[in-house]
Amino acid sequence: MTKTRRPRQAVPRSIAVPRCAATPRPVRRAGAAALALTGLLSAAACSGPSSGKQAAEPVITAEPAALSPSYGSGSPSASANGVVPLTPDVTARLDAAIQRVLSQTGVPGVNVGIITPGGTYLKSFGVADKTTGTPMDPSLHLRIGSETKTFTATAVLRLVDQGKVGLDDPISAYVDGVPGGDGITVRQLGEMRSGLFPYSSDPDFVNTLINDPNHVFTPDQLLAYGYKHPAVSPPGTQFQYNNSNYIILGKLVEKLGGLPAGRFITDQVITPAALGQTSFPTDGTMPSPYAHGYTEQTPSGAIADATNWNPSWAWTAGAMISTVADLESWARTMATGALLKPATQAERLKTLPTGDPGVGYGFGLFDNNGWIGHNGSLPGYESVAVYLPQAQSTLALQLNTDVLYQGSEPSSLFANEITKILSPKHVYSIPPASAAPSTPASGSASGPAPGATSTGSPPSLPASNSPSTVRT
């Protein structure tokens, strides 16, 4: 998620995940970059152990509770479906809220798209290039980080519909070399409950990436960084946001789809969904036109232009590129199951606890207080793409920085402030330890606040002058 004005920085992130005792998050220090593919909505990195492989009772999230008729004295009335009408007054309030977060967080630029049955909102704020001052624009391409996981998950579910794999099959039946693979199912990988150690928290991986952001990684090399560590927990016992899970699922897609993962996702997901501005890159090149992305995930912690950093390190967990309009369309397609059989989509929407009240995780998506979808973060960029089913409404936003603001991903702060106005009974949550920006401080775009934690990635990493985990 990104921040607001000032020299901006953008590193794609996904879900904002608070600390958990079982999997401590690395501390982000000035001079220490923390890279981590994060997932959508704010969610705890792990939930407490439970008995059995899927001890928690799944909750089907297709029909969130309806909103009350109104959300405040003197405010526009929310319709029964949960969103307020996009009146001129509401639009003005949205403009003001977005400008406020932009200014307070130091995010360079943001694109925001809202679609409701009663109207649309599509606006850009700030700049796409801090050097030239080129304005941000909805037509620009940005990296989407962990939004990629929703595409990978959909590709796996398409294979389920084709009868090539079952969600409760052991991953060892399809992908060799996964530690404990006989006891880890495809479903547990998609639901972030494999218990494996995440490669993006391995010190050697982080040091390699931070010191050479154009390094080309293979999927097997990525997984090897995680496989050398013992499991964090038994399969199926706790939620832990983990990029390794989605690299393994990418290998599954290649094995059963018979094509490179990016090609299969393009043919089976992007093209059928009619997403003409969405792509799975094979190198660091950005399609034109694009927004420059800024990050502090560098050896010194200084903000750098990460636009053309090679995303091979994130692969099927976070490498993709899109526009805000395509994300609006995709959020609805993903949440309604337009590309899947109804029974398969129903399995996808069964969410389990994450440890964060109001937030559950299903198969490659979150339910954040009724909003279904994902968020993403990668060095230089952040995104959110979510859908509120009973309101048939979509929210998508993209930022060109991933620099944290007082420990929080800027994208979550934007989504939180926007939904306070748009859907006051369904407010996109951020981790309890985080708060909406109030005044510019040490955690602004000029650099992370000392001691701020990286959201969205689990364990570890030492040394004061080394990043602890890469955010995605």
Give names to the regions the model predicted.
Residues M1-S51, P58-T61, A65:
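Secretory targeting and sorting signals
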Residues L122, I184-W371, N375-P379:
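Short, surface-exposed loop or secondary-structure junction motifs
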Residues C46-K123, T266-D267, T307-T472:
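Catalytic loop of the DD-peptidase/beta-lactamase superfamily, centered on the K-T-G motif
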Residues F125-V127, E296, L399:
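Active-site donor-binding loop signature of nucleotide-sugar glycosyltransferases
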Residues S103, D176-P179, E254:
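Alpha-solenoid HEAT/Armadillo repeat architecture
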Residues I98-Q99, V112, G118-T120, H141-D168, ...:
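Active-site SXXK
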Residues P88, T116, F125, D129-Y241:
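Active-site-proximal loop and beta-strand segments within enzyme catalytic domains
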Residues V90, L94, T148-F151, N245, ...:
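Hydrophobic/aromatic residues within well-ordered alpha-helical segments
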